[in-house]
From Swiss-Prot:
It comes from Sus scrofa. One of its GO terms (cellular component) is mitochondrion. This is Isocitrate dehydrogenase [NAD] subunit gamma, mitochondrial. The keyword Mitochondrion applies. The heterotetramer and the heterodimer composed of IDH3A and IDH3G subunits can be allosterically activated by citrate (CIT) or/and ADP, and the two activators can act independently or synergistically. The heterodimer composed of IDH3A and IDH3B subunits cannot be allosterically regulated and the allosteric regulation of the heterotetramer is through the IDH3G subunit and not the IDH3B subunit. Heterooligomer of subunits alpha (IDH3A), beta (IDH3B), and gamma (IDH3G) in the apparent ratio of 2:1:1. The heterodimer containing one IDH3A and one IDH3B subunit and the heterodimer containing one IDH3A and one IDH3G subunit assemble into a heterotetramer (which contains two subunits of IDH3A, one of IDH3B and one of IDH3G) and further into the heterooctamer. PANTHER family: DECARBOXYLATING DEHYDROGENASES-ISOCITRATE, ISOPROPYLMALATE, TARTRATE, ISOCITRATE DEHYDROGENASE [NAD] SUBUNIT GAMMA, MITOCHONDRIAL. The gene is IDH3G. Keywords: Mitochondrion, Tricarboxylic acid cycle. One of its GO terms (biological process) is tricarboxylic acid cycle. SUPFAM superfamilies: Isocitrate/Isopropylmalate dehydrogenase-like (SSF53659).
Amino acid sequence: FSQQTIPPSAKYGGILTVTMSPGDGDGPELMLTVXXXXXSACVPVDFEEVVVSSNADEEDIRTSLDLYANVIHCKLGDGLFLQCCKNIANPTATLLASCMMLDHLK
């Protein structure tokens, strides 16, 4: 195991910036380990840390991280997506498709 201090040049576009949000509990310790492992392996990644706690307001987190989603909850669908998945998986022996109906929306 060799210890390099200068990461090798990346093949596609140089060093990538990755946002890391350690959170609460075990998160900070795990993220420290991830960052140390990535630095030891000379992975071309630069970590940008964003501090978020469980006490933070959801809207504040989404606004500060520029996260927006257009989510439409629907209980019933026509099954087209599932049928397309099954059609794609059918001729391929290595791809398996299964269906599970979940109803957790109010």
